Curated annotation (Swiss-Prot):
Cofactor stoichiometry and binding remark: Binds 1 Mg(2+) ion per subunit.
Assembly and interaction partners: Monomer.
Protein's organism: Macaca fascicularis (Crab-eating macaque)
Record function comment: Hydrolase highly specific for thiamine triphosphate (ThTP).
N-acetylalanine PTM sites in chain numbering: 2
Entry keyword annotation includes Isomerase: no
Binding sites annotated in the UniProt record for substrate: 11, 55, 57, 65, 125, 157, 193
PROSITE patterns assigned to the protein according to its UniProt record, in alphabetical order: CYTH
Gene encoding the protein: THTPA
Residue sites binding Mg(2+) per the record: 7, 9, 145, 157, 159
Protein name listed in UniProt: Thiamine-triphosphatase
Length: 230
């Protein structure tokens, strides 16, 4: 994804007929892929507590998701995705209050920043794109990702990418429309894979996030929190 774009997304629980419905709506299957994501944080989960999500995708590289200006929007979330390593390092140092580490590779600052692996799992994903009927064919297409993690949890994501905050409301309206067409209940919430992983395999970390967010809603990740994490 191009640096600096804003990701607006909603997670949902896909059913056995979701792919067929996407085809009926004119969706195009872009690809099917299998990949491993590894997430990093401090022992205190300082990044997650600050709504920042650092991961390394196998054969793809590093990504840091940071909250957009609006942050969590009901059942939707808005995040900026950083993929340039010097930019990621600068943001990590800012969030963790570290100075003097320069702007080098992410791997080189993991130890100095006290970052360690907190989760790692494999996902099988199908990626779809489509343009809603009644919208400008030249507008950016909506993305729908359907993923199943190797620990058995499946989650879908409807996503739009925009360049500036002023475009977010229109993107949200499209996400609402497509979610409804896919049969997603208006009030449905779906945790990101990372959150379910922590709940099942790192319950102490999950409980820490619950405590931090006790005055807010249950941590939904952004995915990321997914709801930020893919």
């Amino acid at each position: 994804m191009a640096q600096g774009l804003i990701e607006v997304e909603r997670k949902f629980l896909p059913g056995p007929g979701t792919e067929e419905r996407l085809q009926e709506l004119g969706g195009t299957l872009e690809h099917r892929v299998t990949f491993r994501d590894t997430y990093y944080d401090t022992p205190e989960l300082s990044l997650m507590q600050a709504d920042h999500w650092l991961r390394r995708r196998e054969d793809s590289g590093w990504e840091l998701k940071c909250p957009g200006a609006a942050g969590v929007l009901g059942h939707h979330t808005e995040y900026k995705e950083l993929t340039a390593e010097p930019t990621i390092v600068a943001q990590l140092c800012k969030v963790l209050g570290a100075d003097g580490l320069g702007a080098g590779d992410v791997a080189a600052v993991l130890d100095p920043l006290g970052l360690q692996e907190v989760a790692s799992f494999v996902t099988k994903r199908s990626a779809w794109k489509l343009v809603l009927l009644g919208t400008d064919e030249e507008e950016p297409q909506l993305k729908v990702d359907l993923g199943t993690a190797d620990f058995g949890y499946a989650v879908g994501e409807v996503e739009a990418l925009v360049h500036e905050e002023a475009e977010v409301p229109a993107a949200l309206e499209k996400i609402h429309r497509l979610s409804s067409m896919l049969g997603v209940p208006a009030q449905e919430t779906a945790p990101a894979k990372l959150i379910v992983y922590l709940q099942r395999f790192r319950p102490q970390n999950y409980q820490r996030l619950l405590e931090v967010n006790s005055s807010k809603q249950r941590p939904q990740a952004t995915e990321d929190p997914d709801n930020c994490l893919g």
